[in-house]
Amino acid sequence: MIDFGNFYQQIAKGPLSHWLNTLPSQLSSWQQESLHGKFKLWFNSLEHLPSLKPTSLDLNDSVTARIEPDISVGQREGIEKLLRNLMPWRKGPFSLYGVDINTEWRSDWKWQRVLPHISPLKNRLILDVGCGSGYHLWRMVGEGATMAVGIDPMQLFLCQFEAVRKLLGDDQRAHVLPLGIEQLPELAAFDTVFSMGVLYHRRSPLDHLWQLKNQLVAGGELVLETLVIEGDENQVLVPGERYAQMRNVYFIPSAVALTTWLEKCGFVDVRIVDICTTTTQEQRRTDWMITESLAEFLDPEDPTKTVEGYPAPVRAVLVARKPGAEL
């Protein structure tokens, strides 16, 4: 099964050492009691992947691994088959020894929108809440992060992350833990915390903001990306049963209202740095994610609306800071 021992060793002598009081038993219980019915199938594909160490690794402009001399056609086909066993791939893209994982989301586009507005990540300890397959963790490592820790309870995403890690030479600068933020103690240890595409899934969005704040060191930075609507500080959409075919969407505030929420939770220096309509070029069906995607979630007669009649997805990026001396 998944071995978290390297992570435990890495945090034993740093600001996350107190997490070891609870984390090992928590993850041990998870492995014994909470595995998904398909986990063994996913893990089997992961185990059969070759351990490769790239001779060329680009984490600055993409997540691309190459090797010289190149692997054979048969090896490449074998890798692709095993990676396809881990479908659907939602967050990426990845290019691994000639296997191009064309994911549902162009997560690199989101990163391009976020990166110019945040504090440099060099030498920072980072938490990414709802990290998915870990694409952005590798981009954070590319920016010089000391360590990028992702949490996401979806076990397929953990297997996808571990598959990519194995093909990147067992790189230990990034880690994914199968946890939700409500399962974390108040660590107050991370220099930067990312929450991208999570807030609208929370029944209590202000509680989520408090949870994020409790993971930051004093003066640490929050990077928040979420769905928003147009309007003033009093505008919040509370969808019915579904929004863009998603069942678990609870609150979509205006960007200005979200600023007020952050300030109410004690954040300072709150900035709206980007607002962008999600397009069917950024989120779409591919041969690595073959079910419905954004095009099917929009009104075919009016793409400015969802199939339910709500405003089509628009996402904002906000940056804020926990009080304390700037890092």
From Swiss-Prot:
Binding-site residues, carboxy-S-adenosyl-L-methionine: K91, W105, K110, G130, I181, E182, M196, Y200, R315
InterPro entries: CmoB, Mo5U34_MeTrfas-like, SAM-dependent_MTases_sf
GO molecular function, one term: transferase activity, transferring alkyl or aryl (other than methyl) groups
Keyword Transferase: yes
EC numbers: 2.5.1.-
Gene Ontology annotations of biological process type: tRNA wobble uridine modification
Top EC group: transferase
Disulfide bond residue pairs: none
Spans traversing the lipid bilayer: none
Leader sequence residues: none
Function: Catalyzes carboxymethyl transfer from carboxy-S-adenosyl-L-methionine (Cx-SAM) to 5-hydroxyuridine (ho5U) to form 5-carboxymethoxyuridine (cmo5U) at position 34 in tRNAs.
Quaternary structure note: Homotetramer.
Family: Belongs to the class I-like SAM-binding methyltransferase superfamily. CmoB family.
Protein name: tRNA U34 carboxymethyltransferase
Record organism: Pectobacterium atrosepticum (strain SCRI 1043 / ATCC BAA-672) (Erwinia carotovora subsp. atroseptica)
Lineage of the organism: Bacteria, Pseudomonadati, Pseudomonadota, Gammaproteobacteria, Enterobacterales
